[in-house]
Amino acid sequence: MEKVYTKNAPDAIGPYSQAMKVGNLVFTSGQIAINPASGSVEATTIEAQTEQVCKNLCAVLEAAGTSIEKAVKTTCFLSDMADFASFNEVYGRYFTNKPARSCVAAKQLPKNVLVEVEVIAEL
């Protein structure tokens, strides 16, 4: 088991790592729309937040030695399911291999963001 860390994605905001490598898989922690350069949430729309989340995930996966194209499963959390279609538009541009996915509504997400996504990917 190996911890993954990159300064190109936000630091964890709790007692967890950005990702863990186990065997031939990497498990990311949920990423929210924190800009790693500023350490704050700057995006306000579901589209812009999803874009930042996907960029953060790409950085973590790259640090682990893999890529978003090797994602096998994602779990997505939306604060409002009315954002589902707009979320999917941006998500689909990044996850072109269409990994297995669960998407659920969460009453409230950290820092009051609109979206959070975690990934399991093959190394």
Q: Which residues does each PLM region occupy?
A:
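Short, polar/acidic, helix-capping and beta-turn segments at strand->helix junctions
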Residues: 1-123
